[in-house]
From Swiss-Prot:
Function field: Allows the formation of correctly charged Asn-tRNA(Asn) or Gln-tRNA(Gln) through the transamidation of misacylated Asp-tRNA(Asn) or Glu-tRNA(Gln) in organisms which lack either or both of asparaginyl-tRNA or glutaminyl-tRNA synthetases. The reaction takes place in the presence of glutamine and ATP through an activated phospho-Asp-tRNA(Asn) or phospho-Glu-tRNA(Gln).
Catalytic reaction equation(s): L-glutamyl-tRNA(Gln) + L-glutamine + ATP + H2O = L-glutaminyl-tRNA(Gln) + L-glutamate + ADP + phosphate + H(+); L-aspartyl-tRNA(Asn) + L-glutamine + ATP + H2O = L-asparaginyl-tRNA(Asn) + L-glutamate + ADP + phosphate + 2 H(+)
Keywords recorded for this protein, A-Z: ATP-binding, Ligase, Nucleotide-binding, Protein biosynthesis
Entry keyword Nucleotide-binding: yes
Organism: Levilactobacillus brevis (strain ATCC 367 / BCRC 12310 / CIP 105137 / JCM 1170 / LMG 11437 / NCIMB 947 / NCTC 947) (Lactobacillus brevis)
Molecular function via GO: asparaginyl-tRNA synthase (glutamine-hydrolyzing) activity; ATP binding; glutaminyl-tRNA synthase (glutamine-hydrolyzing) activity
Protein EC: 6.3.5.-
Keyword flag Ligase: yes
Subunit structure as annotated in this protein's UniProt entry: Heterotrimer of A, B and C subunits.
Disulphide-bonded residues: none
Name of the protein this chain belongs to: Aspartyl/glutamyl-tRNA(Asn/Gln) amidotransferase subunit B
GO BP terms, alphabetized: glutaminyl-tRNAGln biosynthesis via transamidation; translation
UniProt cross-references to InterPro entries, sorted A to Z: Asn/Gln-tRNA_amidoTrfase_suB/E, Asn/Gln-tRNA_Trfase_suB/E_cat, Asn/Gln_amidotransferase, Asn/Gln_tRNA_amidoTrase-B-like, GatB, GatB_C_1, GatB_Yqey_C_2, Gln-tRNA_amidoTrfase_suB_CS
Family the entry assigns: Belongs to the GatB/GatE family. GatB subfamily.
Amino acid sequence: MNFETTIGLEVHIELKTHSKIFSPSPVAYGADPNANTNVIDWGYPGVLPTTNKGVVADGIIAALALHATVEQHTHFDRKNYFYPDNPKAYQITQSDKPIGHDGWVEIDVDGVKKKIGIAEMHIEEDAGKNTHERDYSYVDLNRQGTPLIEIVSKPDIASPAEAYAYLEALRQRIQFTGISDVKMEEGSMRVDVNISVRPVGQQKFGTKTELKNLNSFNYVQRGLEYEEKRQQQVLMSGGAVQQETRRFDEKTGETILMRVKAGADDYRYFPEPDLPALNISDDWIKELDAAMPEMPGKRRERYVNELGLTDYDAMVITQTKEMSDFFNATVALKADPKMAANYLQGDVNAYLNDKQVDLQATKLTPEHLAGMINLITDGTISSKMAKKVFKAITEGEDPKAFVEANGLVQLSDPAKLQPIIDDVLSANPQSIEDFNNGKKRAVGFLVGQIMKQTHGQANPQVVNKLLMAALQQ
């Protein structure tokens, strides 16, 4: 029996605003418990929320970035439920009039491109955080009221690999807008997953299960792969898949039953009475659209067509906005684009991985990287010398000053190199005889001796040219 899989993803993106969505409390990751709260966050009777205009703007930007239609006449709704981290006993969100709908992102899995639809996008407030210990439970309301955008996919995702690619594409586009850090490790991107399996040809969707504890894209894919196989095995054995919530165990790679869901939750949505409706003008949408930064697809196209990068190089450089912006700034300083791309993919990435830091947390600057690359391309230093220079610029040193202070300027003057070459040839007559007998390895030996005499500072290209001329006389 053959099966087809349907996967739905609900992604919560925390917006990078200075204050919360309905209160003036600051938004800051890692603050002391309940430090960033006020009476609105606590749900005191009689206090009134005020909509943060910046959050609405970010919602419009997200909709535009994901090719969605902006809902110009929208409002907020109350989603009613009781939980300790929700002191009002309701969440302010959007139900029937989300700020964006009918969008899409394009994914690429093994060279096959596919558009994944986005059903809708809601602006809403986050809840607080509960911490449970043996004898007590604690509530931290710092996160309460933090602005979120919930992005709900259409049932277009047909495999765990496609789910991973969708999340990558979504994160990338949102990150390039600058409205969120989209860091799962800090909670600014969270994913809820639904998956169902049905026999090929069956029109009705299978019974879905919800997966929890998915703290990385890798865990999302692994959890879906296990759950896909589990549901297939249940159906092949004649059983029926139950509507359940299951937890992914990262140690075993399995999903574990948490609870059986008897039916859909009833949150009794109704329009939020304390906030006015939102009327978004055409002019505001056009203004935000005009200010949108260049998206990754456009950047890749420009890198290939205008700067001569390969498709692969362009893809790697645009994995993050931080790396792409750094590349743009480096190339703007007249650095060779291909060399800049190679350094960012190679030495820079290796350095970041070794130090376990982001690019912005280092002392490396586009000015210093471009300066080093320009010293290589103009022949001032060799690629071998550049390794020392690279280490210096990661520590914040100016490349030109470092090269001059440490005597690393490459020796390229033929008038200074020729006597050294003559001395090496005089000291190695056997190598000259070997060369004349067709042994090409002799050239490598002689070059090595010349480099040794110059302490590695001779320009290899000039050395090779002068040496070959001398040998062929």
